[in-house]
Amino acid sequence: MSKIDEVLQPAPLGALRTAYKNEDAVQILSSGIPALDGRTAGYIDAIRHAFYEGANMQPKDRERCLIPVLASRDAGLNLAIHIYLGLMALLSPGEVADIIFLGGIYSGVDRISDGLAAEMKTLTVLAQVAAAPGGCSVEQVITALRQAFAR
């Protein structure tokens, strides 16, 4: 068992999954860029409809594609959010680590170390949110991740 597998235990992960509502995540995540520049709304709507609300791709597969791309770009908060979404789509912490590792083989060893560090930080934040009184809604998780990954 690796350290990655020890950070977020099955019970807290289960609590996060029980509290997770995809529609809440989609609403929160699709409102940021258009709030900055309304011209992006059509672009964000197309992504939302095709990959987050539509049947084009299963959430687990979507996150298997996005996590290594974001890890290869040192994406910080965006990587953390997609690690969370991957876990909510039933990826295990170990699978996420494997995805980061495989992507890093092609993008550089620094991407492996930084990606795994981001996963550890994300899992730690998720464990803290799950342990806090008052539940672990999508909004609470995203807020905690934003605070933890503020630049």
Regions found by a protein language model. Give the residues of each.
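Mid-chain, well-packed structural core segment of small domains
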Residues: 77-97
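Acidic, glycine/proline-rich low-complexity segments that act as flexible tails and inter-domain linkers
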Residues: 1-61, 112-151
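Short acidic alpha-helix initiation/capping motifs at coil-to-helix transition points
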Residues: 39-44, 72-80
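Amphipathic, charged-and-aliphatic alpha-helical interface segments
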Residues: 61-76
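Alpha-helical scaffolds flanking conserved acidic
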Residues: 59-64, 94-99
